[in-house]
């Protein structure tokens, strides 16, 4: 359980940082489209909820180590996508 707690904590920190970066970019990076900012913030919150739930409920029939490695890979990809979107706010 300790590892799951650490993984959830990491997800919380990363998503919080992404949310803060998105807010900062929207305030200090020119005048981005408010709808784009809203959609990006919503996607960060949705991503957070989704991954926290996935940590708690391992896929049946799948080895835990494989499941969590896959989860981390997908999370990292999603984080990089969000970072690219934040960088693209104009």
Regions found by a protein language model. Name each.
Residues 1-4, 30-37, 57-68:
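Alpha-helical rod/repeat scaffolding segments in eukaryotic adaptors/tethers
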Residues 2-31:
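N-terminal acidic leader/helix
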Residues 3, 18, 45-46, 86-90:
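A broad "ordered helical/assembly scaffold" signature
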Residues 8, 12-15, 19, 41-45, ...:
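Generic structural concept
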Residues 42, 50-90:
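Low-complexity intrinsically disordered segments
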């Amino acid at each position: 359980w300790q590892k799951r707690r650490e993984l959830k904590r990491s997800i919380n920190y990363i998503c919080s940082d992404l949310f803060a970066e998105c807010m900062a970019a929207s305030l200090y990076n020119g005048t981005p489209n408010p709808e784009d900012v809203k959609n990006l913030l919503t996607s960060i919150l949705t991503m957070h909820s989704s991954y926290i739930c996935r940590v708690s409920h391992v896929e049946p029939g799948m080895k835990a180590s494989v499941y969590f490695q896959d989860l981390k890979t997908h999370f990292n990809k999603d984080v990089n996508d969000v970072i690219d979107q934040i960088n693209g706010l104009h």
